[in-house]
Curated annotation (Swiss-Prot):
Family: Belongs to the bacterial ribosomal protein bS16 family.
Sorted UniProt keywords: Ribonucleoprotein, Ribosomal protein
Protein name: Small ribosomal subunit protein bS16
NCBIfam families, per database record: S16
């Protein structure tokens, strides 16, 4: 089972709001998911993001692949740097 960390669209027409979900890669965009690990609101001035960093790091450690947009969000929040440092520090 290939697992992805990706965005699920919520909100209403012309006012999107996204949840950052862990889902099987074969599931549809707004379909079944395993766990919600954050939210992303692109409409506010500073693009409000909330993340469960410990859960995201655990999923990344287990091999989950983030989508391109989620990868950019995690990079801006510094989560990927923490993952890289924990993976390669010895």
């Amino acid at each position: 089972m290939a697992v992805k960390i990706r965005l699920t669209r919520m909100g209403s027409k012309k006012k999107p709001f996204y949840r950052i979900n862990v889902a099987d890669s074969r599931s549809p965009r707004d379909g079944r998911f395993i766990e919600t690990v954050g939210t992303y609101n692109p409409l506010v001035a500073e693009n409000q993001v909330t993340l469960k960093e410990d859960r995201i790091l655990e999923w990344l450690g287990n091999g989950a692949q983030p989508s391109d947009t989620v990868r950019n969000i995690l990079s801006k929040e510094g989560v990927l740097k923490k993952f890289h440092d924990s993976k390669y520090s010895k």
